[in-house]
Amino acid sequence: MRRFAVIFFTVLIDLIGFGIVLPILPFYAQRFGAAGLGYGGVIGVFSLMQFVATALLGKLSDRIGRRPVLLTTMLVNAVGYTLFAFAGSYWVLFLSRVVSGFAGGNISAAQAYMADITTPAERSRGMGVVGAAFGIGFSIGPAIGGFAAHFGTAAPGLVAVALSLANFVSAYFILPESLKPELRVKRRLFDLAHIGEAISRPRLRPLMIVWALVPLAFAGYTVALPLHAAAALGWKERELAILFTIIGVTAASVQGYFFGKIVRRVGERTLVIAGTFGMAVAIAVVPFLPSSALLYGWTFILAVSNSVFAPAATGLVSVYADPNEQGTVLGAAQAIGALGRTAGPPLIGTVYDVSAIASFLLAGAVMAVAGLAAFSLAPVPQQSAPTPVRSVPLPDPPPSES
């Protein structure tokens, strides 16, 4: 339980810093002349760098341990937020998201840390704890960012810098290493073959499709939403901060308390299916909502759907994988998700520049296709013993069940 708490607070502080810039970013980008495609590019490049970092940092953490990877990325995050605070042009803002996106790849190390300290039976609950840290970070961060913006455009970024440095100092003293030296493996850091291996497994393929399409649709939605809300409902940083706070509080409540109870009753597969279709409807109705109150209400439905989907999908990846390849498959899923988050923002942003309504309908349709893919998932296999988690396979793994 103590180790759960340590990684929870490490991820929490990291995500508060991330959440601080969320309600500021679309208006910051518009200040430099960015429309749908330009803002989508800022969001997409963050995920592109997260994809690169996910491929690198998960394997690097297998080689040198989780702790040094997490500590180093906290310092890199501070650099990215410094650039954000003092961005004087679109391209400096773009560069700041490149740096922060690379640091954001540390989530693979954080999830591997949680997997190291849990048994397969506890793994979905452990991922729910990480998800709760996301939720609370998204609750607190946007509120802090919206408040800090009253003190100047640099203030939110500087607060995020301070939090990143504070996170580094606290983690340096309280975050122990979770991966024993004898379990560490040296592999090529930029070998992306694990993505193809995961997709090639019939048992895993539908889940990999879900992992690609859900982030694509959701990330595209996050580009269209603030632009539409500003144009149609007159939203500013305050209103957007409230929306992100609703998402964060809901995620923290669902993943931190309710998810463990729900997943034991209905299972991960059912939650993945329900979550994708719930998000599809909540996204598609947005351009037809005439008031902020209705948009906030549907945001709650979206947040509940996403909050049950995310840890359930992560848990399914873990239990579907071969015992000595769990980290490999989890890393592949994270990388595929990052590619979806890279493609979604410029795609939906470009469509938004042509038609706001079409952008939401497209994002909702993509989410619905993900739901159909989830229907084809095989029953969850049984696992009986804890296994070490890596982001690269062991030499000569046993054949898969596929």
Place the predicted regions along the sequence by residue.
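Short amphipathic helix-loop junctions that connect adjacent transmembrane helices
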Residues: 23-37, 223-239
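Residue-level signature of mid-helix packing/kink "hotspots" within the transmembrane helices
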Residues: 19, 47-55, 105, 138-139, ...
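Conserved MFS/SLC helix-loop-helix module at the cytosolic interface between two early adjacent transmembrane helices
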Residues: 51-90
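Juxtamembrane intracellular "pre-TM" segments in multi-pass secondary transporters
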Residues: 1, 176-209, 393-397, 401
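Cytoplasmic helix-loop-helix junction between adjacent transmembrane helices
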Residues: 96-135
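C-terminal transmembrane helical hairpin of 12-TM major facilitator-type secondary transporters
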Residues: 269-313
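Helix-to-loop junctions at the C-terminal end of transmembrane segments
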Residues: 54-65, 254-268
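Helix-loop-helix hairpin linking two adjacent transmembrane segments in secondary transporters
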Residues: 130-173
